[in-house]
Each structure stands twice: as C-alpha cells, then as structure tokens.
Amino acid sequence: MKQPNFLFIITDQHRADHLGCYGNPIVRTPHIDAIAARGLRFNRFHVATPVCMPNRASIMTGRMPSVHRSRSNGIPLSLDATTFSQLLLEHGYDTALIGKCHLQNMEDRPPLVDPEDVGTLKPTPGYAEATHSDLEQAAYRQELRSTWTDPGHRLTLPYYGFSYVELCNHHGDETYGDWSRWAAAQMHDFEAHRGPGRGIPDARFSAPQARRTPLPEHLYSSAYIAERSVDYLRRHVASGSRRPFFLKCSFPDPHHPFTPPGKYWDMYSPDSVQAPETCAEPGPDAPAHVRWIHEERRQGKSLLTAQRMFAVSAAETREILALTYGMITMIDDAVGRILNALRESGLADNTVVVFTSDHGDYMGDHGLMLKGPIHYQGLVRIPFIWSDPAASQTGTSTESLGSSIDIARTVLARAGIAPVNGMQGRNLAPQPGVPAANEPDSILIEDDNQRAYLGFSEPVRARTLVTASHRLTLYLGADWGELYDLNADRLERHNLWEQEPVLRGALLERMVQKMMTLADRSPRPTRIA
C-alpha cells in the first residue's frame, strides 16, 4: 500500500469552539471548515496538559508529560526521546516543520524555582538532576531567542526527527527565528514595526495585550508560514522525489499578544461579539482559585502583560475575542493558500490533512483570560480534525474521547509504521475516516506549574479526569477539588465536590486506575531477571 503524505496543521492556544465547524457563528474559517467537511471531526478531544511546551512534547512522543519529563514550560524535551517524526524519517519520509516548534526553551529568563540549599556542597551540572543530563548544554539552547541573535545560528538537523525546519517561534508580532531573517530581507527596518511600545494607537481597544501592530500583513508570521509551506510543496514536486512527506505547519497565533495585522485588526468589532455567559464576578460558591484570581485583579496585582492568567471584564473580553477572531481568520486564509497549493501540485489525493492545537484559552469563561491550572473546558478541549482521502465517509463527527497523546500512534498507523514501546496513545482511526470502536472510558490531564499562586503555597500541581459525563480535578495540598456534570452543567457552574461524595470517590478511584495505566512501560526488560 502506498504510504500517504501528511499535512499537519497546528495552531497555538486555540479552543475548539473558535472554529465555524465547531459551531462558532461569528468567526469565519471556511478553509478549516472545508477540512472538517472532508474529514472526521472529534468533538471531545482534550490536551494531555493545557500548557504549550509539554503538550507539544506529548503530541510528538505520544506520551504523558510525567513520562516524557517535559512537565512544564521551561523543561526541554530530552534529545533521547523518540518522536513520531523520527520514526517517519527512519521509514523513508521527508519530514518538515515550518513555524513554531517549542520543544526547547524560547525565553532566556530564569525559572521560578525553589531557592538552593545554603551551606551545602552543590553537585556539578551533570549530577544536578536524578538523570545524568545537562539541559544547559548548547544542544538544548537551540530555540532560545538570544541564540538566534547570532546570524549564523541554525538548528542542528534532524531536529527531533525533522529533516527540514524553518523556525518561527514565540507569539503575535514578537516572533523570531528563520522568520525574522526572512522579514528583514524584505523590510530593512522591520524591527521598528513590531513588539511592545510600537503599536498604532487605537482608542477603541484598551484590553491587556491588545496592540495594533504596524507590521504589514505579508510579513506577519501566518503569512510567512503559508508562503514557506507553499514553497516546500512546490519544491517537493519539482524535485521528482518519490518519498512521501510529513509537513507540519505550526502557527504561533492566536496566542496572545493580540496583534492581528492590517485588515484583520478591523475584521471583527467588539460590538459584534458576545462575552461568555459565565463572564462575571464569581459568586461565593465559586472555586477558591477562581475567586483568588478575581481578587488579585481587584487589588491591582494582576500580571496583565505576562504569560499567566488574569481576570477580565466583559468589555475587555469582547475586545480580545474580536482580535482573536481576526487572528484566526488570518490563519484560515493561510490554510487556504496551503490547501490550494496541495491541490495544484497534484498531492491532495494522497495527503492526510490534520488540524489541531496545543491547548485552548479561557477567553472570558468565568471571567478568566489566557491559561492556567484551572481546567475549564475552554482551556482543555481543543479541535482535532482528521481528513483522509481514502475515507469512504466524509463530513462526520464523533463524541468519542480523544487526547493529544493519541496523535502520534494515529499518524504512525496510517503510515503503516509500528509505534515504539512506551507510546501511550491509541489509534483514533483504524479505518480511514472511521473513529475507533474501542472508545476510552476516560482521559487524564496533568498540570505541573513553576508558580505558587491561586492561593496555593507551593507550585500548583493538578490532575484531571474527564469521562463521557463528568470532569473531576484534584489539586495537591488542597482539601477541596472540582467535580462537574458536563451533560447537565456544560458551563461548569455547579461544583459537586461536596454534594456528591460517592460519585467523587468513584471518580477518584478511576483517576488512580488511569494513572496506573499511563505509568511508563519503557524500557522493556532485557532479561527475566
């Protein structure tokens, strides 16, 4: 059987219901909707963790963060980890990544870690951790912004299994990598047209991190990824290569800051969008961590320009939604260009097209913005669309639970490649376009943070179990948790933790069973004893 090509499209911080094909009546995404119309849409697809770096590692390895060990932002994925792109490359695929990677650190700022013990002998770098690895060596500094100030810097290839990479890391109009060199070649002073402090004044918008960028549309990251992806497809055909390809198009948007360029800034008016029904001050029965975030904003202590979550008003939410929709429509236009090139190149009939994201965003749910260890559905539920030209059915959807760890095994199975020992996900589509019959009874979500906040005295650690009907979340060190009936209470307003002790106990037992199931099975024993 001929191996298919793969066009793998991933966005950043993009919740499932911010697409037309997932029921959003406002945002215009005709090209992504067309992928769904030709494919299989998963309506209950969830992250392994709602954080960029570790969930991207889970996607590439098919393993939970606690197992691949990139548990949070700031911990690079080990170069010893086996990614599904490495297996594709090993079995004859051309593997390419254009856009954001984030399997290694982007920021040069130091971590938020406990202070070192005073008065003790410190281990050498090679012995500072439980495993003999030095994550400060040059091989783990390849994606740092500071590293890319060297005009001669390039990623060492193959990079986590990608034999070709054009990097565009970070977010909004603050991206860098191969993109910034490409942009500088077209606009000599482009650095003066992007970033904080260089926005075009617009009195209509005052929401945190909303900035009208002077960067032209054709130099923005989404346009770059479209142009370079189209070029890759055309070069692949022109080369006469008989090798199948896996092309990962990784968009840094619609992650904040909210900087849609040109016409996309004005495409949606805040007056035309509605804040979520739950976008209000939390009542006394709201979970303690939600009340903490709102109190932080009332006291003027919120970090409104940083990466972590903050409380928002309904007016701020409408502004941010309008700009986010503009960023999403720009991505959709870019996707349209790539799909058109796929058809024009004669590749569409043997190319599986996949669309997903690394995690969602609160976007005003419960008066919250961005992301954090509060596992509302807007954050942990993401789009996943699998469009296979060999499918006998198209335009179908499934309510079967799915997880980011399922992606690796699903891609490998379609390519006819066996998974490695320790790969934890399942094949979502054993028959082209048909969801797997062995539906899981639950999925697990992990969340390990560097920060101690939300009222916790230690860095927040959470575990969530999602079943067909409920969501249960447990926090380390807390004598309370969260339990919601997702069928009767889809907005997650009524916490049943105290009212339903029998159900709570049953779900906690299922969570432990799930954690045991997801314990590492690698390496295999090499002898009986």
Question: Can you name each region flagged by the protein language model?
Answer:
Residues 1-471, 475, 481, 494-509:
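Formylglycine-dependent sulfatase
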Residues 208, 217, 513-518, 529:
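C-terminal extensions
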Residues 489:
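Intrinsically disordered, low-complexity polar regions and short flexible loop motifs
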Residues 507-525:
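Charge-dense polyanion-binding interfaces
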